[in-house]
């Protein structure tokens, strides 16, 4: 993230703590309140950039922080207990609308409120997850933007086998309590035998599970498919380090993994949903029922390849695969 974006984010966060109580009490005088619950660490630069873009988009739509809108932030990291507590806290601020990111955070929010409008981002398969009735007409007080349908897991396996053609074993790193993660596993299990690949399930719920699962799998070698979750995103450095230590080719679901040293990734750009999410928040603040706003699918997926990591694994990336890539990290 640029230094300008970093300063902007610090200013946006820090300014909230300095507003006088008279300003904070102005909801009845036209100041609208947006609660933001992110399933990541507060100092994560990826999500700082996301929020800077989100806030700027709302400002472009006429919402100026401290004048007619206020933002309340909660960052949960990977802890489900903290997600529950932060969900309760944000509801206690009486927001007009909530921006919630990741499946686990949205699950926590829906256990606390079904009446406050929610716009979700960074969610996989919201229908299977039980968040919405269907994509065109989500119903209730919730809508948003989702990342992946289960079928994309077949692409993860295919790209991994192209960049590491000798693979015969693959572990699917996933949080078993997240329904789409299990669906990803089932798709991979169905496709792998046709490619001569055996599939292992690497279930994780915390950092210790990641260390254990990848160390155990790494003893015999193979490849990794790392499914999306707050846990895998928050602990991406640990996962990437373990993959490097055990020489495990791995594919990830977002480009920021490859930017952090991951071998290959296929998924949406991490900033893609920020401006559309701001548009939905704007519409809800102006009176639109969230249940009437369709859940939006990704506009495109990006393939990102890290050639430096490939070289460290003694892998030669085919030119045909490099030509398909949206970004190649030298």
Positions of predicted regions on the chain:
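Short hydrophobic alpha-helices and adjacent helix-cap/hinge residues
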Residues: 1-330
């Amino acid at each position: 993230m640029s230094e300008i974006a970093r300063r902007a984010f610090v200013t946006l966060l820090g300014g909230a703590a300095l507003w006088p109580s008279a300003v904070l009490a102005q909801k009845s005088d036209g100041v609208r309140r947006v609660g933001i619950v992110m399933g990541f660490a507060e100092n994560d630069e990826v999500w700082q950039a996301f929020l800077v873009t989100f806030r700027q988009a709302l400002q472009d739509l006429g919402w100026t922080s401290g004048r007619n809108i206020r933002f309340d932030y909660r960052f949960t990291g990977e802890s489900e207990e903290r997600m529950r507590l932060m969900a309760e806290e944000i509801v206690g601020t009486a927001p007009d609308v909530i921006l919630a990111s990741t499946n686990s955070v949205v699950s926590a929010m829906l256990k606390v409120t079904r009446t406050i409008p929610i716009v979700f981002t960074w969610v996989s398969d919201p229908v299977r997850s039980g968040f919405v009735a269907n994509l065109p007409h989500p119903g209730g007080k919730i809508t948003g933007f989702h990342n992946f349908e289960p079928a994309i897991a077949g692409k993860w396996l295919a790209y991994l086998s192209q960049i590491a053609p000798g693979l015969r074993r693959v572990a699917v790193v996933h949080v078993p309590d997240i329904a789409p993660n299990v669906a990803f596993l089932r798709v991979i299990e169905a496709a792998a035998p046709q490619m001569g690949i055996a599939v292992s399930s690497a279930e994780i719920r915390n950092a210790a599970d990641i260390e254990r699962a990848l160390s155990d799998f790494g003893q015999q070698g193979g490849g990794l498919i790392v499914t999306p979750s707050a846990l895998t995103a928050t602990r991406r450095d640990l996962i990437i380090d373990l993959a490097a230590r055990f020489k495990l080719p791995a594919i990830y679901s977002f480009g920021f993994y490859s930017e952090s040293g991951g071998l290959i990734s296929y998924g949406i750009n991490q900033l893609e949903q920020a401006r559309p999410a701001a548009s939905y928040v704007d519409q809800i603040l102006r009176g639109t029922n969230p249940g009437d706003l369709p859940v939006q699918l990704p506009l495109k997926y990006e393939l990102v390849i890290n050639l430096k990591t490939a070289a460290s694994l003694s892998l030669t990336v085919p030119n045909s695969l490099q030509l398909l890539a949206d970004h190649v990290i030298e």
